[in-house]
């Protein structure tokens, strides 16, 4: 008794913990589940506590009822669902081989499954009957590791027999990845027409050009020799040709095909595709399923900008964040002169670069505009703005592109121009009530929102909203902080204002505060601040994440190459793949890029600023920070 009292006194704990977070803790063992499995396996190996016998092909297998019920729906229903097997000591299992049952029980007790070509089919049959998804997945993965052109039809039949949608998808992916080679085999022509039609309609079909799809459609009906010798009849075109996206084919190829066709529905289809190529200015308004890229790679893309090297030079290279490699790659040289701070818009997967700063031989505002088409890796100069706009913002509302205010380096602007892709023309709409430049804009629910910026030497925190239906502007609640040369993004029905700088401290400083505007409440709030300064950043939204690319940090006194990504669901920032150079004034967006671009080595001319060290002298010869007196962030 004395010992018990002494122990109680030694272990006496405070009634009220001194730290408020020390009331209780929950501990979790990472090793417990494996230790439990080892214990159950030891019971099995020792023949202890067995309470059921499975009779499979006339042979007995002892097991633990509770473990079987916990492992799969089949046994759970049998032993815990009120069936007669609940009370039986011996349970007869039908439709499963003894060897497969032993394999499955070994997995249940160890989480390990050994598969081979000799046992995978019977194991799969058993797993489907016993409803064990993990084993089904393992069997499907094993089968896929052995799939080739000779056995793929057999595996398709197996997938259909057991309704294995995941295996069917894996087989489809195999053909999509190897389509050009597979379409030249006899097995290809043995696939059901509906299956081939579905595959040829897929955006995931891996081909280097649309001509390969055209040939693949013909190879389902003709041999390779017949196709190459042009021994085919197209007067009544095969149904599979409906899947060919003729506008994606090169104009020269289409013309040759058109010239050799007799009058037929196919000839009319090819003629329409040729008209698509000839009406280059109208292509964005001629989009449909047959002009859609065969790709599901949405990438963050950046154009132009000024980057820091021994001299301040500009980039004519576009760059994209490769989602497969997690790094930045160059993919096209811009038709536009070396520029920065261009307005950027995406309409029907065409990129528009609007106005901005023409930085060749000093700084001046630009009125010219360009359009990039990733389908054909082609640039096109569209109609110029009616006046020069530098430090502007650009938004897409409906089917129009709006260029809002800015400056021309003589005057601040309040003019707003609207671009109509169907007529390739700009027209003035209602101007802002007052001039502003170095502002930012975004679109939400059919309206355009513009925030902050500068007027003269003053930094602003104003918010304005444009309603295209009434062609009117109205003012909203001011943002929480003055800023300019920032970015805006729309995500999950809210507007985010990110980066920039101001002189509230009496000198230029970065703004780290990130403001969030709710159109529903009409109020501003703050979210997780930026971890570093981003003035003149590129801004792009992909999925539920906002990418902030490069820019200038006035706190550091330099341009930056870092990338920060905001996760709106977690309200936190993380570091992204760093740009290959410190750069500001990058025009960024999200674009669907061709699959071949991501899977092949980069093509095109190198950035002249990198290839020719003397080129810098053609542009500027001032230091990285001293040029700011005349630059965008003056």
Curated annotation (Swiss-Prot):
Cellular compartments annotated: Cytoplasm, Cytosol; Cytoplasm, Cytoskeleton, Microtubule organizing center, Centrosome; Cytoplasm, Cytoskeleton, Spindle; Nucleus
Residues covered by the BTB domain: 50-117
Keywords annotated in UniProt: Acetylation, Cell cycle, Cell division, Cytoplasm, Cytoskeleton, Kelch repeat, Lysosome, Mitosis, Nucleus, Phosphoprotein, Repeat, Ubl conjugation pathway
Role this protein plays: Substrate-specific adapter of a BCR (BTB-CUL3-RBX1) E3 ubiquitin ligase complex required for chromosome alignment and localization of PLK1 at kinetochores. The BCR(KLHL22) ubiquitin ligase complex mediates monoubiquitination of PLK1, leading to PLK1 dissociation from phosphoreceptor proteins and subsequent removal from kinetochores, allowing silencing of the spindle assembly checkpoint (SAC) and chromosome segregation. Monoubiquitination of PLK1 does not lead to PLK1 degradation.
Classification via SUPFAM superfamilies: Kelch motif, POZ domain
Organism field: Ailuropoda melanoleuca
Keyword Membrane: no
Positions of modified residues (Phosphothreonine): 463, 605
Known partners and oligomeric status: Component of the BCR(KLHL22) E3 ubiquitin ligase complex, at least composed of CUL3, KLHL22 and RBX1. Interacts with PLK1. Interacts with DEPDC5 (via DEP domain); the interaction depends on amino acid availability. Interacts with YWHAE; required for the nuclear localization of KLHL22 upon amino acid starvation.
Region (Disordered): 600-634
InterPro entries the record matches: BACK, BTB-kelch_protein, BTB/POZ_dom, Kelch-typ_b-propeller, Kelch_1, KLHL22_BACK, SKP1/BTB/POZ_sf
Name of the protein in question: Kelch-like protein 22
One cellular-component annotation, GO: mitotic spindle
Pfam families: BACK, BTB, Kelch_1, Kelch_KLHDC2_KLHL20_DRC7
Kelch repeat windows: 299-349, 350-399, 400-446, 448-493, 494-544, 545-593
PANTHER family: KELCH-LIKE PROTEIN 22, LD33804P
């Amino acid at each position: 008794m004395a010992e018990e009292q002494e122990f109680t006194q030694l272990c006496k704990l405070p009634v009220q913990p001194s730290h408020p977070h020390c009331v209780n803790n929950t501990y979790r063992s990472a090793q417990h589940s494996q230790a439990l499995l080892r214990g159950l396996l030891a019971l099995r190996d020792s023949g202890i506590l067995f309470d059921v016998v499975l009779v499979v092909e006339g042979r007995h297998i002892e097991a633990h009822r509770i473990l079987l019920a916990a492992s799969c729906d089949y046994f759970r229903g049998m032993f815990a669902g009120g069936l007669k097997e609940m009370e039986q000591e011996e349970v007869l299992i039908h439709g499963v081989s003894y060897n497969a049952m032993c394999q499955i029980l070994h997995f249940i007790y160890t989480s390990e499954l050994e598969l081979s070509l000799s046992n995978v089919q019977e194991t799969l049959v058993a797993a489907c009957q016993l409803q064990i998804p993990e084993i089904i997945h393992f069997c499907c993965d094993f089968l896929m590791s052995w799939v080739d052109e000779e056995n793929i039809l057999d595996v398709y039949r197996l997938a259909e027999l057991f309704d294995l949608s995941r295996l069917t998808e894996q087989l489809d992916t195999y053909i999509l990845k190897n389509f050009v080679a597979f379409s030249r085999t006899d097995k290809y022509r043995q696939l059901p027409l509906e299956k081939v039609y579905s595959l040829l309609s897929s955006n995931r079909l891996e081909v280097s050009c649309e001509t390969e799809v055209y040939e693949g459609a013909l190879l389902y009906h003709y041999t390779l020799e017949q196709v190459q010798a042009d021994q085919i009849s197209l007067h009544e075109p095969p149904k599979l040709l409906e899947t060919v996206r003729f506008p994606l084919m090169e104009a020269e190829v289409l013309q040759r095909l058109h010239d050799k066709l007799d009058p037929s529905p196919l000839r009319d289809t090819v003629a329409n595709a040729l008209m698509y190529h000839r009406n280059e200015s109208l292509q964005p308004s001629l989009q449909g399923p047959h002009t859609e890229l065969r790709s599901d790679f949405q990438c963050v893309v950046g154009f132009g900008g000024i980057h820091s090297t021994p001299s301040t030079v500009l980039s004519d290279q576009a760059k994209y964040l490769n989602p497969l490699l997690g790094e930045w790659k160059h993919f096209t040289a811009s038709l536009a002169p070396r520029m920065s701070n261009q307005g950027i818009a995406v309409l029907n997967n065409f990129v528009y670069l609007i106005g901005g700063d023409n930085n060749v031989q000093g700084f001046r505002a630009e009125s010219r505009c360009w359009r990039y088409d990733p389908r054909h890796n082609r640039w096109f100069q569209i109609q110029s703005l009616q006046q020069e706009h530098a430090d502007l913002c650009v938004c897409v509302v409906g089917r129009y592109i709006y260029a809002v205010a800015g400056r021309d380096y003589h005057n601040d602007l309040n003019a707003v121009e609207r671009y109509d892709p169907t007529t390739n023309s700009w027209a003035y709409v209602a101007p802002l009530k007052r001039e502003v430049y170095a502002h930012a804009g975004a679109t939400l629910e059919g309206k355009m929102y513009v925030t902050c910026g500068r007027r003269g030497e003053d930094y602003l925190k104003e918010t304005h909203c444009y309603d295209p239906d009434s062609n009117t502007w109205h003012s909203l609640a001011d943002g929480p902080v003055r800023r300019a040369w920032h970015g805006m993004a729309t995500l999950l029905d809210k507007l985010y204002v990110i980066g920039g700088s101001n002189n509230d401290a009496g000198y230029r400083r970065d703004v780290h505060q990130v403001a969030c505007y709710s159109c529903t409440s009409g109020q501003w709030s703050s979210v997780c601040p930026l971890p570093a300064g981003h003035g003149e950043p590129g801004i792009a939204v992909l999925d539920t994440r906002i990418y902030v690319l490069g820019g200038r940090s006035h706190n550091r006194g330099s341009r930056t190459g870092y990338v920060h990504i905001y996760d709106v669901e977690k309200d936190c920032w993380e570091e992204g793949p760093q740009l290959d150079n410190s750069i500001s004034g990058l025009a960024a967006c999200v674009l669907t890029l061709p699959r071949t671009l991501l899977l092949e080595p980069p093509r095109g001319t190198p950035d002249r600023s990198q290839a020719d060290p003397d080129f810098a002298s053609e542009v500027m010869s001032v230091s990285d920070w001293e040029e700011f007196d005349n630059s965008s962030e003056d």
